[in-house]
């Protein structure tokens, strides 16, 4: 049965940027990695803001640079008070519920290829399922999680989160849909991930433009044309 129209809030948790994306250290300096994380966040926020069915966007972090980006995009910034990603997400979900959210979609800040079409697809699936979940490329991580209502399932971000989310949903006997999408699946952690991102030819993305500007494309053996 299709539910009443959803009031959807998006939650984008952002980890501390000190020593972020350390597996890219062979290619990017500390500052370049930090800037790359911020540019990926910009891409994700731009997509979320372009998805009309999302009523409000909440960024959760304790990094001042993330605060500045949240302000620039006109989204809510919640300072992370709890230690641990799941605690921070839980706190953000509570904030959303208090303000009328009937659904929340949790998105990582490092999936710069995600599009409004992807998010609208997730929201459409959420009209008939309490949990919609998309995996990472490895099949182990969770790269998109829609919960209706927001407390339908606790979160288990960390190792093997995809399977843990599903196991808990089955235990609770809530309706769920599990899917994959190449764009959503690509979270950039390694040099191979970075090459995959560049090959997607997302030249209009902030993340891609940074790679071009800083000469990283040349380091990868790629010249922008």
Task: Please name every model-derived segment.
Residues 71-103:
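Short phosphate-binding loop-to-helix
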Residues 52-77:
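Acidic donor-binding segment of Leloir-type glycosyltransferases
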Residues 168-225:
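Conserved alpha/beta core of the MobA/IspD/sugar-nucleotide pyrophosphorylase nucleotidyltransferase superfamily
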Residues 114-139:
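Conserved donor-nucleotide/metal-binding helix-loop-beta segment in metal-dependent transferases, i.e.
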Residues 105-107:
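Short aromatic-hydrophobic micro-motifs that form the base-stacking/packing surface
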Residues 37-53:
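A short, N-terminal amphipathic alpha-helix
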Residues 147-169:
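Short, glycine-/small-residue-rich phosphate/pyrophosphate-handling segment
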């Amino acid at each position: 049965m299709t539910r009443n129209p959803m009031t959807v809030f998006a939650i984008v948790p952002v980890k501390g940027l000190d020593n972020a994306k350390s597996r890219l250290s062979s290619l990017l300096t500390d500052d370049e990695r930090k800037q790359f994380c911020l540019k990926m966040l910009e891409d994700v926020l731009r997509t979320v803001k372009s998805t009309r069915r999302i009523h409000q966007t909440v960024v959760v972090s304790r990094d001042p640079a993330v605060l500045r980006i949240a302000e620039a995009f006109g989204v809510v910034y919640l300072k992370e008070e709890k230690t641990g990603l799941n605690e921070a997400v839980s706190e953000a979900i509570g904030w959303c519920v208090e303000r009328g959210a009937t659904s929340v979609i949790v998105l990582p800040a490092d999936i710069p290829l995600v599009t409004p079409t992807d998010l609208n697809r997730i929201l459409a699936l959420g009209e008939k399922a309490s949990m919609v979940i998309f995996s990472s490329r490895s099949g182990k991580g969770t790269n998109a999680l829609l919960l209706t209502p927001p407390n339908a399932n606790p979160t288990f971000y960390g190792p093997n989160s995809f399977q843990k989310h599903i196991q808990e949903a089955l235990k609770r006997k809530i309706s769920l849909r599990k899917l994959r999408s190449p764009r959503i699946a690509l979270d950039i952690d390694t040099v191979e991930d970075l090459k995959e991102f560049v090959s997607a030819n997302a030249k209009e993305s902030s993340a891609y433009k940074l790679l071009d500007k800083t000469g990283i494309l040349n380091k990868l053996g790629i010249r922008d044309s």
